[in-house]
């Protein structure tokens, strides 16, 4: 199950019920579509990486990214085995919004990057994987990871800054990642 009993004998004798998340109860997959690389990882309920695959490219195209996913996913699932695969809840996908606007930043031909226009990333990943998909802006996803697993756990309200090829931001308000109406509230 998703929870397991974890209580000292003294509390058991008092009839207390203390439970914790069972790290083996649920598995999920995460996919990152980046400017120079893509990655797929399988994680447990605590966020620990169980297996992962990565590909590097000069610039992303829908064909490159989806071919990588189609080639990687079956091998990852084989590594996990039936017991773990049956516990997969879904796949989270993160990517920068409007990838077709990166022409200059990734030195890609216009025709290649325009292939992202109208390409429905969540629908393509759902069709390819057969899993439920949650799609989020890449920096909002990074903010979420910091909030769940990093120093962000210590604060209820903060601005998150990601500095890489570009500078992006995320917001945490009242202990919750705030994506905003458009999914990238922290963008600037």
Where are these regions (language model features)?
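Detector for glycine-centered tight turns/loop "hinges" at secondary-structure junctions
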Residues: 47, 103-105, 175, 183
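Acidic-glycine-rich active-site phosphate/pyrophosphate-binding loop
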Residues: 44, 122-123, 186-188
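Glycine-rich phosphate-binding loop and adjoining helix at the ATP-binding site
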Residues: 49, 53-157
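Generic marker of residues within folded, mature protein domains
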Residues: 9-11, 21, 30, 83, ...
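Residue-level signal for beta-strand positions within conserved beta-sheet cores that form or flank
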Residues: 36, 89, 186
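Acidic, glycine-rich loop-and-beta core segments that form the ion-binding/anion-interacting portion
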Residues: 139-188
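N-terminal helix-turn-helix DNA-binding module of bacterial transcription factors
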Residues: 1-23
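Gly/Thr-rich phosphate-binding beta-strand-loop-beta motif of the actin/hexokinase/Hsp70
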Residues: 15-51, 160-177
């Amino acid at each position: 199950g998703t929870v397991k009993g974890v209580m000292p004998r003294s509390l058991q004798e008092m009839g207390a019920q203390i439970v914790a998340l069972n790290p083996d109860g649920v598995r999920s997959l995460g996919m990152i579509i980046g400017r120079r690389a893509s990655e797929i990882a399988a994680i447990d309920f605590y966020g620990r990486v169980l297996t992962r695959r990565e590909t590097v490219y000069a610039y992303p195209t829908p064909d490159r990214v989806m071919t990588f996913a189609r080639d990687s996913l079956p091998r990852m699932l084989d590594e996990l085995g039936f017991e773990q695969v049956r516990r997969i809840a879904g796949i989270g996908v993160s990517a920068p919004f409007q990838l077709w606007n990166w022409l200059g930043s990734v030195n890609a031909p216009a025709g290649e990057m325009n292939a992202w226009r109208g390409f429905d990333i969540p629908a393509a990943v759902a069709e390819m994987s057969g899993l439920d998909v949650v799609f989020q802006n890449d920096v909002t996803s990074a903010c979420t990871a910091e909030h769940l697993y990093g120093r962000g756990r210590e604060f209820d309200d903060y601005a998150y800054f990601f500095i890489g090829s570009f500078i992006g931001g995320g917001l945490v308000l009242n202990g919750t990642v705030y994506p905003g109406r458009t999914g990238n509230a922290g963008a600037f």
